[in-house]
Amino acid sequence: MSTRTEELRAIPLLAGLDLLALEKLAAGTSELEARAGQPLTHPGATGTGMFFVVEGTVEVEAPEGVRELGPGEFFGELALLTDKGKRTARVRAKTPVRCIAVDRATFETLLKDHPDVAAELLEAGLGRLD
């Protein structure tokens, strides 16, 4: 099992996926590293992927407030779940951070193949809009 697959398996949202599904997902990912203070997304930008935090902390500034996300958490999914495909939040690295980036095509395949993950993502996304 690759390191990337192991990192994905540690993410609570993906914990129910079998090894084959995790390896397929890992093949469609890349790594994003950022230094503290570096912006990662900004409102209005077109969302081309979502991100799972592996190391470090990010700060999310959204219309509903500011929150921090750490290892095992994710951001950027709302832009992929809506027709508009636009980012709704400003995200910056609060500490040095390493994320796994999932592109739109891989994300859409994941949702199609695993409706349970799609439901959890939708629930999480809607919860963030409250």
Spans of features found by a protein language model:
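Cyclic nucleotide-binding regulatory module and flanking cytosolic helices
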Residues: M1-E31, R35, L80, D113-H114, ...
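A small-molecule sensor/coupling module
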Residues: R4, L19-K24, G85-R90, R98, ...
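Short, proline-centered helix/strand-breaking motifs
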Residues: P12, D103-R104
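Cyclic nucleotide-binding regulatory domains
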Residues: L13, A36-P96, E108, L122, ...
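Hydrophobic residues at beta-strand termini and immediately following loops
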Residues: L32-A34, L69, V102
